[in-house]
């Protein structure tokens, strides 16, 4: 199923899929977009149903927008992959999230060579191949709460044979970054002290001596041993 943007399209020959209800094709001078809007069946559709036949509308990020997250969608089948990327773009539009994409990424090709059979055909081999298709969508200037809601909704509506891989980016001031760095350095120093400190045996002996010193019987034994 083809999708069309609201903008201008090059003039092409009419196709059968956009025939009118009578069965006659529209004039050759009209573009496919004009043929679609002139179709009486398309004109009777509700706006939410008619939007399925068009490309999803997107909020394009400006130069001042900051990259907040990137989303990769992977699948072994391109039809379901394209369908779900279309759904993601529409979801981002209704949540007012500026996005870039979907951009196709290089395919990952995996191949295996195995024995055809352990008995009769063990001398012959058979090749197996698996191709992973992926798309990339980048999200800009999103509130963290909105981004979390967006990802949770996609997880809820995800198809069973698709894999979603998301990366979120957080930006902070230099002062906050220095404070976090100092706190992390202190925690590492404490960890090093624990590693370089006394062993478990030494700790046990120290605690045992503390307990014995408070015991009156042990004190009497120490006094008697010192007198001798």
From Swiss-Prot:
Location within or outside the cell: Mitochondrion
A Pfam short name: Ribosomal_S10
Molecular-function GO terms, alphabetical: structural constituent of ribosome
Gene Ontology CC: mitochondrial small ribosomal subunit; mitochondrion; small ribosomal subunit
InterPro entries, per the entry: Ribosomal_uS10, Ribosomal_uS10_dom, Ribosomal_uS10_dom_sf
Domain of life: Eukaryota
Alphabetic keyword roster: Mitochondrion, Ribonucleoprotein, Ribosomal protein, Transit peptide
Transit sequence range: 1-17
Main location: mitochondrion
Gene Ontology biological-process annotations: mitochondrial translation
NCBIfam families found in the cross-reference section: rpsJ_bact (TIGR01049)
Subunit organization: Component of the mitochondrial small ribosomal subunit (mt-SSU). Mature yeast 74S mitochondrial ribosomes consist of a small (37S) and a large (54S) subunit. The 37S small subunit contains a 15S ribosomal RNA (15S mt-rRNA) and at least 32 different proteins. The 54S large subunit contains a 21S rRNA (21S mt-rRNA) and at least 45 different proteins.
Function: Component of the mitochondrial ribosome (mitoribosome), a dedicated translation machinery responsible for the synthesis of mitochondrial genome-encoded proteins, including at least some of the essential transmembrane subunits of the mitochondrial respiratory chain. The mitoribosomes are attached to the mitochondrial inner membrane and translation products are cotranslationally integrated into the membrane.
Family designation: Belongs to the universal ribosomal protein uS10 family.
Protein name: Small ribosomal subunit protein uS10m
Gene this protein is translated from: rsm10
């Amino acid at each position: 199923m083809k999708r069309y943007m609201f903008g201008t399209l090059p003039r092409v020959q009419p196709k059968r899929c956009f025939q009118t209800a009578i069965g006659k094709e529209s004039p050759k001078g009209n573009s496919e977009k004009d043929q679609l809007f002139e179709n009486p069946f398309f004109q009777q559709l509700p706006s939410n149903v008619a939007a399925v036949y068009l490309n999803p509308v997107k909020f394009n990020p400006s130069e001042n927008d900051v990259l907040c997250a990137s989303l990769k969608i992977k699948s072994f089948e391109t039809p379901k992959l394209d369908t779900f990327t279309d759904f993601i773009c529409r979801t981002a539009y209704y949540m007012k999230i500026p996005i870039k994409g979907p951009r196709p990424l290089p395919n990952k090709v995996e191949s295996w060579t195995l024995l055809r059979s352990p008995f009769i055909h063990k001398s012959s081999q058979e090749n197996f191949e698996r191709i992973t298709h992926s798309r990339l969508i980048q999200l800009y200037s999103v509130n963290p709460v909105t981004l979390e809601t967006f990802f949770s909704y996609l997880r809820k509506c995800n198809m069973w044979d698709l894999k979603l891989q998301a990366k979120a980016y957080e930006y902070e001031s230099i002062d906050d970054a220095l404070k976090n760095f100092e706190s992390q350095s202190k925690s590492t120093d404490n960890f090093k002290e624990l590693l370089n400190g006394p062993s478990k045996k030494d700790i046990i002996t120290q605690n045992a001596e503390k307990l014995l010193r408070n015991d009156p019987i042990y004190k009497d034994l120490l006094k008697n041993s010192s007198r001798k």
